[in-house]
Amino acid sequence: MEKYVVVLAAGKGTRMKSKLYKVLHQVCGKAMVEHVVDAARAVKPSKIVTIVGHGAEDVEKVLAGKSEFVMQEEQLGTGHAVMQAEGQLAALEGATLVVTGDTPLFTSETFEKLFAYHEEEGNAATVLTAEAPDPFGYGRIIRDDQGNVLRIVEQKDGKPEELKVKEINTGVFCFDNQDLWAALKQVGNDNSQGEYYLTDVLEILRKAGKKVGAYKMPDFSESLGVNDRIALAEATRIMQRRINEGHMRDGVTFIDPATAYIDADVEIGNDTVIEGGVTIKVHTVIGSDCLITSGSRIVDSQIGNGVTVTSSTIEESIMEDNTDIGPNSHLRPKSLIKRGAHLGNFVEVKKAEIGENTKVGHLTYVGDATLGKDINVGCGVIFSNFDGVKKFHTTVGDKSFIGAGSTLVSPINVADHAFIAADSTITKDVGKYEMAIARGRQVNKKDYWHKLPLSEDEEWK
């Protein structure tokens, strides 16, 4: 059976009260509609068609290469939205799944089971349903004595006995493709909203003698539709729990899973420990045997094995195996920390390479620089890389020593085995085995104390 997917993503989402198109709001680092499309892609459909309207260009950018797109110029209901895909799908044989783009929690396993059930039962249409703890506001699934689906009753239209039903319509459907397009031609808009409803297709098919069924999924939470910021937060909470539990099953320790915020595309190796209050975003990859402590934030970075990140921020950078950073340090984009290097307290690195086993202890800024291996950088060292117009680069060779409080004014080259005395301002190259001292000579003035204004103060004698 050929599979096709239609994603409805044309609604504006006014209840979000946002300039951002609703389906582009993120849940754990991915737009809601991208979660839906990624789950659909996992069942290997022959074609995915996303119906776009408001913010079409932005949606197409997010889903580039993952879907075809059709514009719904005027939003006239779910049935009308599906009709827009006629040119892409109407001539094809197979089954078509229809899902909305604001339901980010559906899994590929649920979609796969829906397709399989639809095919096994020989249905013309299959509704994805769930048992709701509180079904208020949902369309109820009304079945006959044999369990066949008779109709979907909306909250406002239901009789008291019908509203007691807890099996609800999730808004996801699977149709025989040819039956779908034949029935859509019969859907009208004679209702209070003047819209074309996709649910009318079920009644049309049933009256035509076609089989209409329902597949009840076990996890009601998957069906959560996001229409406002409250639902967005709830979807994020559920997705975050799902992500963190997946990592824990793979051998990652979470000290407090409820406060560890891990994006959907993050990878973490086994025996790594994640403390509470940690944020890891985008496509970050973390190796095995690492420790990420509270207050750390890692964005789109590569972290090797055996790395310790202590309450620090890492952005678009690489830390190789057995390195450590922090507390309270910051790797800015395009930084490379090589194997065994140490970055201590309050160290900021920007677009720089720190060589193997090099130590940058504390209170230091390293920007636009390449440091070799086995270097010791003292406290308070500054790489002065900006003249107000352009950035300049400095290179420091292997096994050099940079004394505390020194400033290296770029561009300069410090050779291997060079020694820079503490509190020096270095503006020229330093050669191999040379020691550079660049500071004012100390002068001690004898008996100068008695010339001070405070010299007569008894407390100062």
UniProtKB/Swiss-Prot annotation:
Question: What lineage, starting at the top, does this entry show?
Answer: Bacteria, Bacillati, Bacillota, Bacilli, Lactobacillales
- Metal-binding recorded as keyword: yes
Q: Name the positions where acetyl-CoA binds.
A: 422, 439
Cite a GO CC annotation: membrane
What is a single molecular function from GO for this protein? glucosamine-1-phosphate N-acetyltransferase activity
Identification of the protein by name: Bifunctional protein GlmU
Q: Where is this region: Linker?
A: 230-250
Keyword field contains Nucleotidyltransferase:
yes
